[in-house]
Amino acid sequence: FTDWNQSVVNEKVYTVALVGIAVISWLMIRWSDDPDGPKADRILVLVAYLSSLGYGVHMAGMLAAPAVAVAVLVRRPRTLLRWRLLLAIAGALVLGLTPFATQPIRAAYNPPIDEGEPTACRNGLHLSCTFSSGTYDAFMYNFNRGQYGKPALDQRQAPFTGQIGMWWYYFKWQWMRDPFNQNPAMQSILAAVFFVLGAFGAWVHFQRERRSFWYFGTYMFTTTLLLIYYLNFKYGATQPVTGDVAREVRDRDYFFLWSFSAWGVWAALGLVFIWESVASFFGTERTKLGKDLITLPTDQALKFGSPILLIAIIPLFTNWQWAPRSGQTDTRDFAHDLLDSVEPYGVLVTVGDNDTFPLWYAQEVEGIRRDVIDANTSLLNTDWYGRQLLRRPVYDYDEAKGPAVYRGKQWEKPKGPPLNMSLSDIDAIPEAEQLPNRMAFDAGGLHAILDPDSLEEGYLQRADILVLRMIKDAWPARPVYFSRTSGDYPSRTLGLAKYLIEQGLASKVIMPPAKPTPDTVWMPPNPFRGEGEWMDVQRSKELWLHDFTAPASLIRRGSWIDEPSKGIPYLYVITGGDLIGALRTVHDTADAQHAFATMMGVAHMIRMDGPGVIPPLNSGFWEQGMLAGPPPAVAATRGDSAHGPKSSDTRAGVVLHDTGPKKRPPARPGR
């Protein structure tokens, strides 16, 4: 059982890899029964092929390899001395890895989604660049997962005991998922029962079928203690740990499904052992097994003892409520809503997986709002994503399929990408640039202050430079938006606080209005919203009430059990609250009531509607401090007159103006 159920990766990757391991395990048990049989060598060659083929699906495809080696060493070590068999196994391993060869070939054709870009070819597939050191280096970087930068194994990200505790925490989920901690005692009891059953099963396996135990026992060791040590995870995202500790961004329970599934086999053996033991009280008989006579329960006795087998179906009932996903369209609907929050041909800046991968699916599979460019800041920090933005074609906006609020207007199709740069210009952008002091960024009348104290150790990241460059090159002719999932990134990191207006689930870069309008409301900071900003009341109302589809699907879903991804439904609570306050400020009470009911439905789904959590509609909280017009102007100083005019600094085509000396911390070591 896993609750990472907003991702089809579970079915398309982990489950497929698990099927491969299951087939390998079945083959090795057959081989262990008859290692000198006529098909024994063929089985080993097939196992080698399936292992490397499974590696192409997921690295876990090789998890059975140590167990295969131990089984061969224990059962028939002389097998390792037969060079023809070893050559056949080596050939099978290479053959199974050949699907990897498609990666640089595919990448050379610049597909819409090409993570890692494992090729040195920049203008199509050619032999000279495909068979080059550049392609080899790019491919091996992907193959070895270099982008993740895991520390050395002797640098533990959490104590090994804590990492084992993470395994146990997720082990308990398999027998009874208790997402809201309502029955912790029962969950622990069931986990203990199935743990003991598995331990009994391991003992029974060792006693009765030692030939296959060497394979299965080694596999279990590999997928538990050895894998836990190798993965070297931080504490789990929701693992109960006291104190402020480093945690994974999501619960990594799916990395241990290999051991959980295998433990289920041992638990089944243990349950059968208990069934036979109980049945023996109702009658036994002597049965010949090979040359030996053994005592077994009679058929009638087994029937009397069979109710004990009902233990096996307990997890089916305890997890049924949380496991099915039929009718869950909220992830797709969220992508639809976020894309529709952006005007035609807009650039949407996102920050992570949850606000990017659903958008890719919606655009590339369902063809939803392909005119919008999704610029992910995490990926913009890589050396390849910027090139993909340059190559991405400008897709036509389909007015008939777009929101009604955009119809009847002329939307000029851009002639090129949002970056006025060449591929070599993109490649020349540094990984990071240190700001010596406060700098001003100017573009199309916009004047933003970049403060080193608001940057990571005073450095402007590659992604920050590219986002500023997109504003400089494309805005205001092309709309630029920041997803509301980006938090205070545009306001704090890029200094754009007063240049943002909320429209649906995104904030658009604008020139702040000079006078009040009926549709423009200033929203001050509050505990739900965080930073203050403008709201386009009419646009947000039309999107919320007539276009958004996720609130209804979230309410229909009924509950949200994955705590780390709760930010998606929570986003609807935040933006709903903003809209409610704005509508009440402009005295649109009927629509405010409608929006409040929808927001409370989503809040109930994530259990955020308890007493005192969300203020009542008529409490005055939502419209508190809102102004139907601009807030007091805040002067943005362009220079310190006491020091005279300041110099300009050009960084990757982004002109920054020095606003005055400011003491900085010493430069950090090379990145």
Regions found by a protein language model. Give the residues of each.
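ER/secretory pathway lumenal C-terminal domains and tails of membrane proteins involved
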Residues: 8-18, 30-47, 51-252, 256-345, ...
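Short, small/polar-rich loop/turn modules that mediate ligand/substrate recognition or access, typified
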Residues: 26
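Short Lys/Arg-rich cationic patches that frequently serve as NLS/NoLS or arginine-rich RNA/DNA-binding motifs
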Residues: 659-671
